[in-house]
C-alpha cells in the first residue's frame, strides 16, 4: 500500500505552490476547510487549507485525518522568528510544539499544558531528520527547536518577553501548529512542522509578514516537495 502524506497550511498563499503541482486532483470543501487529494511527483497527498488559528486548524486536521487517512502530517507555511540566528526565508523545524496561550497551572499543570495532554507535543524524529537533511541539501539556513502557538499575531517586544519568560527555548511562533500536533497526538499520527520565517516577531512584524509571506510560502514548499520525493 502506498503511503499518503497529509500536508496542512492555514492560508491559500501557503499551499498554492503545492496545490499547483498536484495531479489527479479531487477537492472536498467542508466547514470552511478545503482538502485537495491527488499526487505530487507520484506521491499521494491530501493537502488541507485549514484557515487561520487553532480552532480552524484543529477542526481541519480532524477532518483531514478522518476523511483521507494520511499516514503522516507535515504542517507548512509561515512563522515569526524568535531565535537570534533566524532571518526572513529561513526554515524552522519542530523538535517540540507547545501552546503559549494556555494556563491551567492552578490545577498543577505546566504552563501551556492542557489536561489529558502532554506539556509538549513531540514530532516524529525521522520526519525531523528528513526535513533537516533536505534543508542542508538545498543550502537553506534551518533551525530546529521549540515552536509555540497561540491565537494572536505576535507583534511587539512586550508580547515576545511574556512568551520567552515561560518558553525560553522558543525559536518561532505561529497560530496553528500546536493544535495540529494535539490532534495528531490524539489520532496517533506522526507529524512534523516545517515552516519558513516571514517576519521577525517585533513591532514591525505585521509589515514584514505582508511583504514576505510569498517568500516564506516558496521556501517552506521547497522543503516539503523535497521531503515528498523521499516517498515517491
Swiss-Prot record:
This protein's pathway: Amino-acid biosynthesis; L-methionine biosynthesis via salvage pathway; S-methyl-5-thio-alpha-D-ribose 1-phosphate from S-methyl-5'-thioadenosine (hydrolase route): step 1/2
Annotated catalysed reactions: S-adenosyl-L-homocysteine + H2O = S-(5-deoxy-D-ribos-5-yl)-L-homocysteine + adenine; S-methyl-5'-thioadenosine + H2O = 5-(methylsulfanyl)-D-ribose + adenine; 5'-deoxyadenosine + H2O = 5-deoxy-D-ribose + adenine
Listed Pfam families: PNP_UDP_1
Active site: 14 (proton acceptor), 199 (proton donor)
Superkingdom per UniProt: Bacteria
GO molecular function: adenosylhomocysteine nucleosidase activity; methylthioadenosine nucleosidase activity
Keyword line: Amino-acid biosynthesis, Hydrolase, Methionine biosynthesis
Enzyme class, spelled out: hydrolase
Binding site for substrate: 80, 154, 175-176
InterPro entries, alphabetized: MTA_SAH_Nsdase, Nucleoside_phosphorylase_d, Nucleoside_phosphorylase_sf
Cited SUPFAM superfamilies: Purine and uridine phosphorylases
EC annotation from Swiss-Prot or TrEMBL: 3.2.2.9
Biological processes per GO annotation: L-methionine salvage from methylthioadenosine; L-methionine salvage from S-adenosylmethionine; nucleoside catabolic process
GO CC entries: cytosol
Family: Belongs to the PNP/UDP phosphorylase family. MtnN subfamily.
PANTHER family linked to this entry: 5'-METHYLTHIOADENOSINE/S-ADENOSYLHOMOCYSTEINE NUCLEOSIDASE, 5'-METHYLTHIOADENOSINE_S-ADENOSYLHOMOCYSTEINE NUCLEOSIDASE
Physiological role: Catalyzes the irreversible cleavage of the glycosidic bond in both 5'-methylthioadenosine (MTA) and S-adenosylhomocysteine (SAH/AdoHcy) to adenine and the corresponding thioribose, 5'-methylthioribose and S-ribosylhomocysteine, respectively. Also cleaves 5'-deoxyadenosine, a toxic by-product of radical S-adenosylmethionine (SAM) enzymes, into 5-deoxyribose and adenine.
Name of the molecule in the record: 5'-methylthioadenosine/S-adenosylhomocysteine nucleosidase
Species the sequence originates in: Haemophilus ducreyi (strain 35000HP / ATCC 700724)
Amino acid at each position: 500500500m502506498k503511503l499518503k502524506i497529509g500536508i496542512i497550511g492555514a492560508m491559500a498563499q501557503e499551499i498554492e505552490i503545492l496545490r499547483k503541482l498536484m495531479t489527479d486532483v479531487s477537492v472536498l470543501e467542508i466547514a470552511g476547510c478545503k482538502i485537495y487529494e491527488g499526487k505530487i511527483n507520484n506521491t499521494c497527498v491530501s493537502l488541507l487549507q485549514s484557515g487561520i488559528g487553532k480552532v480552524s486548524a484543529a477542526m481541519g486536521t480532524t477532518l483531514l485525518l478522518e476523511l483521507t487517512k494520511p499516514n503522516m502530517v507535515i504542517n507548512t507555511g509561515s512563522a515569526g522568528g524568535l531565535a537570534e540566528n533566524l532571518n526572513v526565508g529561513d526554515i524552522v523545524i519542530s523538535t517540540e510544539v507547545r501552546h503559549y496561550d494556555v494556563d491551567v497551572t492552578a490545577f498543577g499543570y505546566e504552563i501551556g499544558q492542557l489536561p489529558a495532554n502532554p506539556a509538549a507535543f513531540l514530532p516524529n524524529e525521522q520526519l525531523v531528520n528528513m526535513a533537516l537533511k533536505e534543508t542542508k541539501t538545498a543550502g537553506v539556513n534551518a533551525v530546529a527547536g521549540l515552536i509555540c502557538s497561540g491565537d494572536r499575531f505576535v507583534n511587539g517586544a512586550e508580547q515576545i518577553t511574556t512568551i520567552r519568560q515561560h518558553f525560553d527555548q522558543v525559536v518561532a511562533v505561529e497560530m496553528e501548529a500546536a493544535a495540529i500536533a494535539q490532534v495528531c497526538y490524539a489520532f496517533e499520527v506522526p507529524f512534523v512542522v516545517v515552516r519558513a520565517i516571514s517576519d521577525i516577531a517585533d513591532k514591525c512584524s505585521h509589515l514584514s509578514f505582508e511583504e514576505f509571506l510569498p517568500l516564506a510560502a516558496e521556501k517552506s514548499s521547497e522543503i516539503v516537495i523535497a521531503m515528498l520525493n523521499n516517498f515517491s
